Swiss-Prot record:
UniProt lineage: Eukaryota, Metazoa, Ecdysozoa, Arthropoda, Hexapoda
Gene name, Swiss-Prot/TrEMBL: FAS1
Source domain of life: Eukaryota
Protein name: Fasciclin-1
Subcellular location: Cell membrane
PROSITE patterns on file: FAS1
GO BP annotations listed: cell adhesion
Organism the protein comes from: Schistocerca americana (American grasshopper)
GO CC annotations, alphabetized: extracellular space; plasma membrane; side of membrane
Tissue-specific expression: Expressed on different subsets of axon bundles (fascicles) in insect embryos.
Domain FAS1: 27-155, 167-321, 329-470, 474-622
Keyword Membrane: yes
Principal location: membrane
PANTHER family: FI19380P1, PERIOSTIN-RELATED
Stored Gene3D superfamilies: FAS1 domain (2.30.180.10)
Length: 662
């Protein structure tokens, strides 16, 4: 009896260990886990109706990528996709840290699933892995290890309409596109150019690559197809990277096959928004061009994204990259669709812009700073359309009569350029990011905008998409001081002395002569001791008095043009918070100058509009020699002391005179 009992005891121990192991990896089988999760009910419905998937779970090792119910709500089902569940399964069990750059699915032909790691986030094709709900491990009754990962999107393979094309590479995709389900899109024109230029092998490359294929719609007008040469075709392929839209950082540039010593073309992804929806775009940037390939960027909408193929991923795009054959006018006209990145800008030009379109058509070289769709969602922007004269002036503020790239602004240290608006300039600032990246901001009419899509090339100029409408103020005087990188010191002094608080008042009209940082630096050179005291807490009283001399509060704002009229022959007297400000104004061809206390100073940026006033940025500080004196912290002590010294001196003089007279 001892032998059977010992055998039974050993068997019980083994079963207990197996149960403990199963408990450690997952108390339920993978099938039970999926069935028991209400958020995976749609996926389980697929599973129980597919015999092959059921057999795989029962008999084999497997990794399952299960989409959530929300993912199915965003998925457009098609006839004959009942086997798509097999594209969510592999024949080996992989935890997340065991996943390589690709795994083979169980769908016919074993098309790959591409794995992307981006910091702590993992993507399968374009679907994000929900890591907190993944890595569930179990064993089936045959002892086969199985792993479940939950993803936020349904995984979609290439769909063949003929039933004979499985797991195509990019060349097979292009060459047999009529046998694939691409909706209404056709790619015959691009395929023809690939064959004519003998570039088929580019699309047969083994490994992992990203291919951009323009649809037939983008090959108009007729001269455009002839511009698709070998180098342009190379500019549609990113080697050694599989880039899905959700898994790829925006605005990060990748070298194309057209990145050589003589020609350098990079590609990046971007996202355009109208304030409601987001639309993916791809941008080619020809950094170094040649006689047949212009420098600058070309923007193309991705009309069908994230099509996985054997050697990477394909994106269908609205037009060819690298080809610059539109004028600025034609570029704007190309965004008649409501989801185009400049659709709203183009519409307001048609509605209220007068002959603005004709103006940019006649210009040979221009740069257009075009506000994005999101910029036009501001209420103040919509109110502008009622005043057509004012609106036209604002449109002119967005045009510069020369071709100006971001590189020229940065490398040539361009600070300001005149616009087509009368006596209005644009002012540039380059912000250096922590990763070495550079962001260019542009100010016009008091509005500071960021260039979000630079260097879009046209045959007669350049277009930069910006995130705000220039000339439409949306900040108070205080907020403008806080956010303007040239006015840091004046803002800091105002904060120290509590002077800035009033500048947020919405129902007051301010005219503020604001010294820029360079003006304070000049003052430091002239009087380093006084400059040092300005930034000490003990002298906030005097600082406040100095700033008060720069601020005019009235029932109106004073533009430089208005001040020029007031002081056409004599100096004008403005009621500042501290006494009066007596100024003379001189106007030159491009600038304004003001005279105060016998000193002429340049107005670096006149007429910076704010919601509650106007700012004139200048190169000088209205400061007198006796404004900063040593004394008590509130300023009263030194004034009393100074008065006592002067009075004592006068008494001594009077006493001496009387003694001499006697």
């Amino acid at each position: 009896m001892e032998g059977p009992r010992l055998t039974a005891l050993m068997l019980l121990l083994l079963l207990t260990l197996a149960a403990d192991r199963a408990s450690a990896k997952g108390e339920k089988s993978l099938e039970y886990k999926i069935r028991d999760d209400p958020d995976l009910s749609q996926f389980y419905s697929w599973l129980e109706h597919n015999e092959v998937a059921n057999s795989t779970l029962q008999l084999r090792q497997v990794t399952v990528f299960a989409p959530t119910n929300l993912a199915f709500q965003n998925y457009k089902a098609r006839d004959g996709d009942e086997n798509i569940i097999l594209y969510h399964m592999t024949n080996l069990a992989h935890s997340l840290d065991q996943l390589g750059h690709k795994v083979l699915s169980e769908l016919d032909g074993n098309p790959p699933l591409w794995i992307t790691r981006r910091r702590d986030t993992i993507f399968v094709n374009n679907a994000r892995v929900l890591t907190e709900r993944s890595n569930y491990e179990a064993v089936n009754r045959h002892g086969k290890k199985q792993v479940l990962h939950v993803v936020d999107s349904v995984l979609e393979p290439v769909w063949s309409t003929s039933g004979q094309l499985y797991n195509p590479d990019a060349f097979q995709f292009l060459n047999q596109s009529e046998n694939l389900d691409l909706g209404l899109h056709r790619v015959r024109s691009f395929r023809q150019r690939v064959f004519q230029n003998q570039k088929q092998n580019d699309f047969k490359l083994e490994g992992k690559h990203t291919f951009f294929i323009p649809v037939d719609e983008g090959f108009k007008p007729l001269p455009r197809p002839e511009k698709i040469d070998q180098k342009v075709i190379d500019g549609h392929i990113i080697p050694n990277h599989v880039l899905f839209t959700s898994a790829t950082p925006l605005d990060e540039e990748y070298e194309t096959l057209a990145f050589t010593d003589m020609l350098r073309v990079v590609i990046s992804f971007t996202m355009e928004s109208d304030g409601k929806a987001h639309k993916p775009y791809v941008k080619s940037n020809t950094v170094i061009g040649d006689a047949n390939h212009a420098t600058g960027a070309v923007l193309a909408e991705i009309v069908k994204a994230n099509i996985p193929v054997k050697n990477g991923v394909v994106h269908l795009i609205q037009r060819p990259l690298m080809v610059v054959d539109n004028t600025v006018k034609q570029f704007l006209e190309g965004f008649e669709k409501e989801d185009g990145p400049l659709y709203k800008f183009y519409q307001v030009i048609l509605d209220a812009g007068g002959d603005f379109i004709n103006q940019i058509t006649e210009m040979k070289d221009l740069t257009l700073f075009a506000p994005s769709n999101a910029a036009w969602s501001e209420t103040t922007a919509n109110n502008l359309l009622t005043d057509r004269k004012k609106f036209r002036e604002i449109l002119n503020l967005h045009i510069v009569a020369e071709k100006l790239s971001i590189e020229s602004i940065v490398e040539q240290n361009v600070k300001q350029v005149p616009t087509m608006a009368d006596r209005k300039n644009l002012y540039f600032n380059v912000v250096h990011g922590p990763a070495g990246n550079k962001t260019v901001t542009v100010e016009g009419g008091g509005v500071n905008a960021t260039i979000v899509q630079p260097n879009i090339a046209a045959t007669n100029g350049m277009v930069h998409i910006i995130n705000k409408i220039l000339g439409v103020p949306y900040t108070t005087v205080k907020e403008k001081l806080r956010t303007d990188p040239m006015l840091n010191k004046t803002y800091h002094l105002g904060e120290m002395s509590d002077f800035n608080k009033m500048l947020d008042e919405k129902h007051t009209k301010f005219t503020y002569f604001v010294p820029r940082d360079l003006a304070w630096k000049k003052m430091e050179v002239r009087d380093p001791s006084a400059h040092r005291k300005l930034f000490m807490k003990e002298f906030t009283y005097q600082v406040k008095q100095i700033l008060e001399r720069h601020l005019v509060i009235s029932d109106r704002v004073y533009t430089m043009g208005a001040l020029k009229k007031l002081a056409s022959n004599t100096s004008s007297v403005l009621p500042t918070m501290r006494d009066h400000l007596r100024l003379r104004v001189r106007e030159t061809e491009k600038s304004y100058y003001v005279e105060w206390q016998g000193e002429w100073t340049h107005i670096f940026r006149p007429d910076v509009e704010c919601t509650n006033g106007i700012i004139h940025v200048m190169d000088y500080v209205f400061m007198k020699e006796g404004d900063i004196v040593v004394g008590g912290p509130d300023g009263a002590g030194q004034q009393v002391a100074s008065f006592a010294v002067v009075a004592s001196a006068h008494l001594v003089v009077l006493a001496t005179v009387r003694w001499l007279l006697h």
